[in-house]
Amino acid sequence: MARRGKKKGRPISGWVIFDKPKGMGSTEAVSKIKWLFSAEKAGHAGTLDPLASGMLPIALGEATKTVPYAMDGTKVYRFTVTWGEERSTDDLEGQPTKTSDKRPSREEVEALLPDYTGVISQVPPQFSAIKIDGERAYDLAREGETVEIPAREVEIDRLEIVGFPDADRTEFEVECSKGTYVRSLARDMGRDLGCYGHISDLRRVEVAPFTDEDMVTLAKLEAVWPPLPPKDEDGNVIEPAPRRDFSALDALVIDTGAALDCLPQVPLSDDQAQRVRLGNPVILRGRDAPLEADEACVTTRGKLLAIGYIEHGQFKPKRVFTAG
């Protein structure tokens, strides 16, 4: 029987709410954070375009099991629309496809905002990760194909002007549901205003339940990163190698359960926790314990233990976390 290889890295679990700089791709960001923390496993909750900056929640270790909950959270973006040009990618990266000399007044833009609030229908950009017949739309677009991407419904909770620096640009903030393309908002508003438009700056500031106060920059992470052991000229670690102290870096990690604020949370006793660790159901005690829930999580000593459901006052685990 083949022996299973030992995992590389530390078994650290939790969330790093990374303030991604412009120019860095989401996959590149995950690799960088995984390397800095020397983590066994890492993943992100929601792609952020290389040209965009801001919040990219990165899950380490067992927090990767909670990624779907973070991806479903409401997003908040601040963005700038430059009027007068529609571009192939709906942002600065693309080539101009339509132009106009018209520039909208602040009053015209404000009058349009109610049309983009609530449940709206939008067509994702040609350059997007949407799959068309099994292929990514951006791959087809790069090959010169114009593809028909079906419109889909998204929800805009809030859209407001936050700046009007000059006639060419308007700054907005939007609070929206999963699946909303801000580039499509800019394109469609430009068309409705008769002047065309594209995104010239985009920053994500929230992915619920995380806020901008949770974000950490690359500089802050690197400032407390424990250096690698010194090596000789042949590339071998000089012995005895000092033990690396990750405590300052690990202090920037948010608890795995933070992504589950949307679920009912029930604390368990030590005896109940042991039963759940073994995959067994437990009867919930206490006046505040829910009798029914399609999804809920339980904790032990303040740490996330499991996600499951509650039926007739009994918690039944579906996913157990070893860190609990």
Swiss-Prot record:
GO terms for molecular function: RNA binding; tRNA pseudouridine(55) synthase activity. GO terms for biological process: mRNA pseudouridine synthesis; tRNA pseudouridine synthesis. Pfam families: TruB-C_2, TruB_C_2, TruB_N. Residues 87-107 are annotated as: Disordered. The keyword Iron-sulfur does not apply. It catalyses: uridine(55) in tRNA = pseudouridine(55) in tRNA. PANTHER family: PSEUDOURIDYLATE SYNTHASE TRUB1, TRNA-PSEUDOURIDINE SYNTHASE. Responsible for synthesis of pseudouridine from uracil-55 in the psi GC loop of transfer RNAs. This is tRNA pseudouridine synthase B.
